[in-house]
């Protein structure tokens, strides 16, 4: 079989494991490796897991593979950032997670597969080449190193960005060049945490609920309770960084092939939470809820919602989206208030 052989390798793995607490470093690395694997899902076949690296293959050889790897790189650093934001643990593993990095090795060649004790192994001279390339002379920690063979189907616009980095091994000389991924990393880490400013929000509102901020926050974030007040058949919860809410997703299933995904961008329990979702006409919608006690048995929630509409139809889009969001919001707010008024009964229903 011929195609691209791809190695995704976490940089700084050995130092991270050696210098940090074993339990937390193991959990963090498992989360990162799982994130890389999920990003590759359905696009690159993961043939081998090699500690801090994944050996992958694909019959695709075009520039689309590079686009996939850039996307995976962004998701990797987005997860690192979420872990750093979410954790309050002072251990070295949690405090130095931003020192980890990711690099890719890409080579085009022939390979075959065989099994040992039920585990797939890759075989072939080109498999040896891509593994040798993990040890190279590239003067960076994060990059995409591609052989000349891998680049043959890529456009000149991309090849022109690569810097030559020929390598020599026992398997012979390998013509290769690398792409610096540091600008992508910097863009992720420097991207401001989106919170909706009430002054620029397209929808602003205040609702008062019976109960404490902790109770209200729980009703907003507990998937089983969200299922009840949204009135949908199912809400699947995907945990965020280190099991937190930051980066978490709520997959709200409305019916066959109908799903709305709410992603938590920022959270400071029980006082504030920012989510984003895809909404008809508007595209991405952002919502920030600011939660504050108002007396011993009442909680005030100030909500700010924003989206971006462009073009000549923007006023009409704004009108339609605002109308729909206010309609849904009124229904949901009423249900949450009713549920909070009889919390024991609703908690029992949610646990069924």
Stretch-by-stretch model annotation:
Residues 208, 227-228, 237-286, 300, ...:
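Glycine-rich portal/gate segments that line the openings of hydrophobic small-molecule binding cavities
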Residues 306-352:
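A conserved amphipathic terminal alpha-helix motif
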Residues 139-215:
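Intrinsically disordered, glycine/charged-rich C-terminal tails and inter-domain linkers
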Residues 58-60, 255, 306:
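Residue-level recognition of strand-loop junctions within catalytic nucleotide-signaling folds
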Residues 12, 37, 110, 211, ...:
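Beta-strand elements of well-folded, non-transmembrane domains
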Residues 192-241, 352:
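Hydrophobic ligand-binding cavity/cleft-lining segments
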Residues 61-168:
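Catalytic beta-strand-to-alpha-helix segment of the class III nucleotidyl cyclase homology domain
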Residues 1-71:
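Catalytic NTP-binding/metal-coordinating core of nucleotidyl cyclase/transferase enzymes
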């Amino acid at each position: 079989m011929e195609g691209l052989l791809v190695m995704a390798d976490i940089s700084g793995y050995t130092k991270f494991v050696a210098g940090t607490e074993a339990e937390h470093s193991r959990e963090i690395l498992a989360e990162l490796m799982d994130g890389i694997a999920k990003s590759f899902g359905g696009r690159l076949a993961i043939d081998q897991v090699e500690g801090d690296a994944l050996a992958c293959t694909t019959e695709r050889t075009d520039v689309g593979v590079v686009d996939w790897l850039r996307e995976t790189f962004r998701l990797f650093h987005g997860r690192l950032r979420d872990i750093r934001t979410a954790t309050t643990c002072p251990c070295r593993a949690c405090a130095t997670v931003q020192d980890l990095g990711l690099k890719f090795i890409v080579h085009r060649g022939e390979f075959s597969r065989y099994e040992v004790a039920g585990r797939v192994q890759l075989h072939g001279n080109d498999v040896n080449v891509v593994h040798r390339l993990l040890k190279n002379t590239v003067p960076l920690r994060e990059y995409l190193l591609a052989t000349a063979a891998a680049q043959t189907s890529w456009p000149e616009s991309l090849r022109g960005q690569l810097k030559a980095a020929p390598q020599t091994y026992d398997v012979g000389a390998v013509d290769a060049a690398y792409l610096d991924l540091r600008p992508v990393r910097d863009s992720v880490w420097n991207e401001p945490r989106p919170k909706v400013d009430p002054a620029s929000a397209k929808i602003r509102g205040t609702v008062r609920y019976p109960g404490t901020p902790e109770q209200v926050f729980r009703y907003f974030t507990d998937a089983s309770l969200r299922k009840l007040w949204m009135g949908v058949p199912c809400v699947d919860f995907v945990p965020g960084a280190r099991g937190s809410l930051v980066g978490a997703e709520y997959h709200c299933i409305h019916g066959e092939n109908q799903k709305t995904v709410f992603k938590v961008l920022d959270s400071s329990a029980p006082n504030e939470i920012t989510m984003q979702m895809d909404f008809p006409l508007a595209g991405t919608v952002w919502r920030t809820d600011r939660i504050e006690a108002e007396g011993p048995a009442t909680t005030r929630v100030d909500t700010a919602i924003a989206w971006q509409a462009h073009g000549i139809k923007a006023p009409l889009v704004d009108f339609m989206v605002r109308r729909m969001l206010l309609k849904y919001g009124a229904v949901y707010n009423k249900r949450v208030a009713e549920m909070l008024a009889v919390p024991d009964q609703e908690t029992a229903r949610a646990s069924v």
